[in-house]
């Protein structure tokens, strides 16, 4: 066990392609998606709870959890938080593997990823907690065990743990690497109010639509490293549902393209709008133009997934 704070980076994501098939018996939808990990991130710090005298065997490994940064008040600080659940599952696996009892921890989350914004902020926090707890517990769990825990926590957690550019199938948790050249530059526009992922999926189930499940052209474009070619193949089946629930997103997409973006797309279930740009300068210009009316940021991808700082 360590006696010092461990800080991990929780990278956000954008879906370059999100094809949504039919609902399964378990309530999930069959997905074909291409994820790209972005530099916009949260940070997770795991610290031994020095003043906590309770036994992790009886009370659980997490003593307390706090949240700071963007929209911190909207993030739960109890066991409903995925980061809390990630820590508990890691500790349980550690003990099953014969690991020694550990001192309870405090988890501090500093938010940079928008809450309920379609960029997997909660999943990324869980993934980074897995990385931090692995080090805290002495790395007694294998990578495959950690990925299995990630899949139990949520569909986006395995990708946010691994990062880079990957094809996701099943409910998004079955991942294979995608060859991608170059760095892609994004301008991001955030909405003041989040969108519920289940609500967006319920809406799409009510719509007459044809799923887009072929990513051949996008994968070929990614190999070239040409943002113009990639922009031509960005697609999100959930976008129509998100626009139906939040019609103002259509205006944001139009404004971003008019400001110079190559293409704009609703990120995941929304409401964040992501604009692929030709270069860093254009991304800055698009973000600046949109910042008159919205909160914005710039990001690059692909980047590493969850990792402990300095490792």
Swiss-Prot record:
<keyword id="KW-0414">Isoprene biosynthesis</keyword>
<dbReference type="InterPro" id="IPR036554">
    <property type="entry name" value="GHMP_kinase_C_sf"/>
</dbReference>
<feature type="binding site">
    <location>
        <begin position="114"/>
        <end position="124"/>
    </location>
    <ligand>
        <name>ATP</name>
    </ligand>
</feature>
<dbReference type="InterPro" id="IPR013750">
    <property type="entry name" value="GHMP_kinase_C_dom"/>
</dbReference>
<dbReference type="GO" id="GO:0019288">
    <property type="term" value="P:isopentenyl diphosphate biosynthetic process, methylerythritol 4-phosphate pathway"/>
</dbReference>
<comment type="pathway">
    <text>Isoprenoid biosynthesis; isopentenyl diphosphate biosynthesis via DXP pathway; isopentenyl diphosphate from 1-deoxy-D-xylulose 5-phosphate: step 3/6.</text>
</comment>
<keyword id="KW-0547">Nucleotide-binding</keyword>
<dbReference type="GO" id="GO:0005524">
    <property type="term" value="F:ATP binding"/>
</dbReference>
<dbReference type="InterPro" id="IPR020568">
    <property type="entry name" value="Ribosomal_Su5_D2-typ_SF"/>
</dbReference>
<dbReference type="InterPro" id="IPR006204">
    <property type="entry name" value="GHMP_kinase_N_dom"/>
</dbReference>
<comment type="similarity">
    <text>Belongs to the GHMP kinase family. IspE subfamily.</text>
</comment>
<keyword id="KW-0067">ATP-binding</keyword>
<dbReference type="InterPro" id="IPR014721">
    <property type="entry name" value="Ribsml_uS5_D2-typ_fold_subgr"/>
</dbReference>
<dbReference type="Pfam" id="PF00288">
    <property type="entry name" value="GHMP_kinases_N"/>
</dbReference>
<keyword id="KW-0418">Kinase</keyword>
<dbReference type="InterPro" id="IPR004424">
    <property type="entry name" value="IspE"/>
</dbReference>
<keyword id="KW-0808">Transferase</keyword>
<comment type="function">
    <text>Catalyzes the phosphorylation of the position 2 hydroxy group of 4-diphosphocytidyl-2C-methyl-D-erythritol.</text>
</comment>
<protein>
    <recommendedName>
        <fullName>4-diphosphocytidyl-2-C-methyl-D-erythritol kinase</fullName>
        <ecNumber>2.7.1.148</ecNumber>
    </recommendedName>
</protein>
<dbReference type="GO" id="GO:0050515">
    <property type="term" value="F:4-(cytidine 5'-diphospho)-2-C-methyl-D-erythritol kinase activity"/>
</dbReference>
<feature type="active site">
    <location>
        <position position="13"/>
    </location>
</feature>
<feature type="active site">
    <location>
        <position position="156"/>
    </location>
</feature>
<dbReference type="Pfam" id="PF08544">
    <property type="entry name" value="GHMP_kinases_C"/>
</dbReference>
<dbReference type="GO" id="GO:0016114">
    <property type="term" value="P:terpenoid biosynthetic process"/>
</dbReference>
